[in-house]
Amino acid sequence: MAVLLRTTTSATTATSGGSSSATALLATTFRRGGRRLLLLPATRGSAPRRAALLTARASAEPLEVCAKASLTVPDRLGDCPFTQRVLLTIEEKHLPYDIKLVDLANKPDWFLKISPEGKVPIVKLEEQWVADSDVITQAIEEKYPEPSLATPPEKASVGSKIFSTFIGFLKSKDPNDGTEQALLSELTSFDSYLKDNGPFINGETISAADLSLAPKLYHMEIALGHYKNWSVPDSLSHVKKYMKTIFSMDSFVKTIALQEDVIAGWRPKVMG
């Protein structure tokens, strides 16, 4: 069974003088507890260009996104950092989209037909279902180049080893095996990079590399906090500020997984 969460658009906004402008604002509608919540994203760029961009996007067909359903709460997005990366990209591009939540423990036949390996995320682009977050985000960047989220090649791998070292530390049963130090080493390197080049990986503007790394840092924070009683040291102030900044972005808040789901999602690796 899949649950559909649909994005909507608002064609006009009121000006200070009480008139309406033609600026189209994209919004995502959620239903929680019988209430309808409308969330509006922030936008970047000059006002006329932004207005034209959003007007065009508002009339576009919503992208179809298959995502993991929550393990703990019905009709809620689940814990997949790769899916959140894709959703963050779509949000930052101000594109409308429909999410189809899939119970990965009981994969329906329709889902297995479009994703034979049974993996998420998978997005419908140009009438084709596309898998793998790397491929999906690159395809979205090419099809919708504005606003640009491209990360320069020389910066694209910044922070890329943090996730694997986090997993190594999380799974470790030996406090002296060096896995914690390996993670701290990667975080320290990233902190130094942000100090000299931040606040984001590509400087002043957020880019694809941030949208890939941030969901993984969120999982790191929740999972290590729960299973290891561990947190990023205060001495790594630039990393902590980076996480706080991105975690508070509208697009991140709208696509975030519940802490309970992150904890449940990592439990098999910890207990295995």
Swiss-Prot record:
GO MF annotations, alphabetized: glutathione dehydrogenase (ascorbate) activity; glutathione transferase activity
Induction note: Down-regulated during senescence.
Positions with a binding annotation for glutathione: K68, D79, K107, V120, S133, H219, W266
GO biological process, one term: ascorbate glutathione cycle
Positions of the GST N-terminal domain: 70-148
Gene3D superfamilies: 1.20.1050.10, Glutaredoxin (3.40.30.10)
Residue span of the annotated presequence: 1-57
Residues forming the catalytic site: C80
EC id: 2.5.1.18, 1.8.5.1
Domain GST C-terminal: from-to ranges: 126-272
Alphabetical UniProt keywords: Chloroplast, Detoxification, Oxidoreductase, Plastid, Stress response, Transferase, Transit peptide
Protein location: Plastid, Chloroplast
SUPFAM superfamilies: GST C-terminal domain-like, Thioredoxin-like
Catalytic activity: RX + glutathione = an S-substituted glutathione + a halide anion + H(+); L-dehydroascorbate + 2 glutathione = glutathione disulfide + L-ascorbate
Record's GO cellular component terms: chloroplast
Highest taxon of the lineage: Eukaryota
Residues binding L-ascorbate: K68, D79, K269
Functional summary from the UniProt entry: Involved in ascorbate homeostasis. Maintains redox pools of ascorbate by recycling dihydroascorbate (DHA) to ascorbate. Involved in scavenging reactive oxygen species (ROS) under oxidative stresses.
Family statement drawn from the similarity comment of this UniProt entry: Belongs to the GST superfamily. DHAR family.
Record text on subunit structure and interactions: Monomer.
Protein's UniProt name: Probable glutathione S-transferase DHAR2, chloroplastic
Organism of this sequence: Oryza sativa subsp. japonica
